[in-house]
Amino acid sequence: MPLSVFAEEFAEKSVKRYIGQGLWLPCNLSDYYYYQEFHDEGGYGSIHRVMDKATGNEVIMKHSYKLDFSPGILPEWWSKFGSLTDDLRERVVSNHQLRVSREAQILVQASTVLPEMKLHDYFDDGESFILIMDYGGRSLENIASSHKKKITNLVRYRAYKGNWFYKNWLKQVVDYMIKIYHKIKILYDIGIYHNDLKPENVLVDGDHITIIDFGVADFVPDENERKTWSCYDFRGTIDYIPPEVGTTGSFDPWHQTVWCFGVMLYFLSFMEYPFHIDNQFLEYALEGEKLDKLPEPFAQLIRECLSVDPDKRPLTSLLDRLTELHHHLQTIDVW
């Protein structure tokens, strides 16, 4: 939906608000939120900033099309019914044709261990669903873009080895990666696989980071129900597809997650992806000359995360390696 159309229609946008336990309340978005501004958009739909009328808090509204809708179920304790006035309760209806999205289910489950991922509201307008979540700050991709020109020039002229600014940027990158690892591992341990981990889906607000966009996320079965993940289960960004998806037609979610860390480390170091052609990752043509100018432990970690053999990636030692690398960057002046 074009931005101008959505902004103009917001005040009168008729939706159904999910109250819980299969109940819906016909209403307008403007009954609960003030529209503020457009934030971002993609193939899924669009992101907008709105203000909660009840609290005055700025929150994020994600408007997603039902092109690839996966239904979910919210637990019984997730309910808005108790906060309704008597006259609103009379308008609540049961609609078995409406379902909440799997993304909403994942957010509610994730918020039990990561409160910043709380789902505040859920709406359905027939053609799309709308999620209301906390505002988590700037995306890591946006932060990186603010340094892109300087880093690109340092890389282009091979002037980044030993550069003070670049060393501090690498240290910041590793700090981000450690925080991202903790969040992703917590989610993975409760059975949630993000499936699209990248800087665009990491928000930074001071010292805090939030993982966002669970539109293609999936549930990880326990070891007793372990399934084979086929290439069709990978629905993330093409620049983050691990080689085993193409060579064997299957992959392991954690192996792919570690691969994503390698791609992110490379991208944030050089402001470009390690593989530029759609199928180049199958040939694994890393540019060694660039990596050789990084601190050796940094370059080695990228190489291992981007190993063609999934079992040779630092599957169990990634956090330790990142922590050691962070300490190494703090103790060296130049390399």
From Swiss-Prot:
The keyword Nucleotide-binding is annotated on this UniProt entry: yes
InterPro entries: Kinase-like_dom_sf (IPR011009), Prot_kinase_dom (IPR000719), Ser/Thr_kinase_AS (IPR008271)
UniProt source species: Invertebrate iridescent virus 3
Pfam families hit by this protein: Pkinase
Gene3D superfamilies recorded: Phosphorylase Kinase, domain 1, Transferase(Phosphotransferase) domain 1
Catalytic class of the enzyme: transferase
Protein name: Putative serine/threonine-protein kinase 040L
Keywords in alphabetical order: ATP-binding, Kinase, Nucleotide-binding, Serine/threonine-protein kinase, Transferase
Amino acids binding ATP: H39, D40, E41, G42, G43, Y44, G45, S46, I47, K62
Similarity-based family: Belongs to the protein kinase superfamily. Ser/Thr protein kinase family.
Lineage of origin: Viruses, Varidnaviria, Bamfordvirae, Nucleocytoviricota, Megaviricetes
